[in-house]
Amino acid sequence: MLHMQINLIKKYGAESLFLILLLCLPINDANSSPWATPDDLLAKHDLQMLTDSGLLNIPINTWPIAWGDVAYNLKVENVKDLSPETLLSLQRIKQRLIDEELGGISANAEIKFAKNPDRIMTFFDPVNTKKLAASSASYLSENMAINLKFEKTDSYELLDESYISLARGNYSMTLGSKKNWWGPGWMGSTALSTNARPIKGLSIERNFSDPFQNRYLGLLGNWDLAFILGDIQNAN
């Protein structure tokens, strides 16, 4: 058995075997994460609907967005007054909050193909290479989030979006890399977008966008903060 395992690793590579093993496991639709991430088109649509309808009052232009902030600031008084479209968005977001609250360990695997890959990345996260295989595993608890992701194409192997994050009070500190999207756009952003690889380094973010307690600064309303310190490589 040991001889067979060694031959398999030599033939296919350890990363490929890791991907095959994950494909054989029962997996969730999405990895457990404390944030709604830039590539979740449906979540962006639903959060925009809830914000426009006045049910949610948080900044939604700095992704990733903390699910805890969404849960804390989601205010629904009378469901009967909602339009069918807004009600559907509300139901989907509530279900996402329940799923993310469960936490625990989850795994995911994906294989993508594209005849004509997109050169420009959008919020939809299109395929920018002809072939891509990726596997990821994550762990989520009350104060800790860990994600390990491996991507392989014909030309590169990446560990982007791998991180460990610790929450302390109203702030979380993350070491590694996460996708960022700063701006209201869907097709692109002039600040930060997924068109470049995520920045590897240290990031500090607010978990809840509560307004200032000062009666003057409180007039600014809910606010967010994201600090990123990292090295942007030439390849980006």
Predicted regions, residues:
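Bacterial N-terminal signal peptides
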Residues: 15-26
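N-terminal periplasmic/intermembrane-space "pro-region" immediately following the signal or transit peptide
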Residues: 30-124
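Short loop/turn motifs that connect adjacent beta-strands in outer-membrane beta-barrel proteins
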Residues: 59-61, 80, 95-106, 140-146, ...
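Transmembrane beta-strands of outer-membrane beta-barrel pores
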Residues: 111-117, 141-143, 150-154, 168-170, ...
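Extracellular loop and loop/strand-boundary signature of outer-membrane beta-barrel proteins
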Residues: 120-123, 187-192, 232-235
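Solvent-exposed loop/turn segments connecting transmembrane beta-strands
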Residues: 124-129, 151-159, 196, 233-236
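Residues on the lipid-exposed face of transmembrane beta-strands in outer-membrane beta-barrel proteins
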Residues: 135-139, 162-168, 175, 202-208
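Signature for the C-terminal beta-barrel architecture of outer-membrane proteins
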Residues: 181, 201-236
